[in-house]
Each structure stands twice: as C-alpha cells, then as structure tokens.
C-alpha cells in the first residue's frame, strides 16, 4: 500500500511539470519573418523538462512585452528535422535571429533579465 501511494505521488508529481505546448516553428513562418526584418526567437523544449517549463513561462511573458518579435518553438525530441535545420542539439536552447543572422544562442538560461537581454540584442 505504501509503495503504491509513493508511486502515485511520483507519477502525478512528474506529470505536473509537463509542458502543454505545441510546435509553432515552420520554415515558411521563419523565412517570411526574416524577410520582413523581424526579430525571431526560437525555443527548443521537451514536455518533461523543468528548465524548459521555466523558459516557457518567461517566453510567454516576453511575447506580450515584445509585440514586434516573432516567437517560434518546437519539441526537440519529436521535431528532429527542425533541430537539424537550426543546428540545435539540446532542449532549453533559445536562439535569436535578426536580419537573417543568428545574433544570440543560449542553453539552459532561466534568468528573465538575461533572456530579455538576449531578445533585445541588435
């Protein structure tokens, strides 16, 4: 009985950290945004990653604060073609593009000020 209760707590505890998020990255949106001179923020995540969940919370707020910036994301383990296209090897990667160039890349960053600074980089 005790083992069953512990197992239930562990399973529900892990699932409570799962990210409910969808892949929004497409080549078409990425290329069009670049052509339009927009800043593009790309986030690589995994649904069971705690660091990714922290980043999602920050990036969701950033979408409201940086209205002219395009935010795209993809699930690293499911969307391997996107990861290869962008040369992204790890969950928790945030990449910023401006004027068809990568201007910033971080892995594992969860500090809001640092992420915002990365987005503001020109």
Q: Could you describe each region identified by the protein language model?
A:
Residues 4-13:
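Sec-dependent N-terminal signal peptides
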Residues 10, 17-37, 118:
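N-terminal leader/targeting and pre-domain segments
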Residues 27, 31, 56-60, 80-83, ...:
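Extracytoplasmic/secreted envelope proteins and their assembly/folding machinery
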Residues 35-47:
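Short active-site neighborhood of thiol/selenol oxidoreductases, capturing the structured segment around
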Residues 44, 68-80:
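Thiol-based oxidoreductase modules, predominantly thioredoxin-like and allied folds used
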Residues 51-65:
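Typically the conserved alpha-helix immediately C-terminal to a functionally engaged Cys/Sec
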Residues 86-95:
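Structural micro-motif
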Residues 98-122:
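Non-catalytic, surface beta->alpha helical segment in thiol-disulfide oxidoreductase systems
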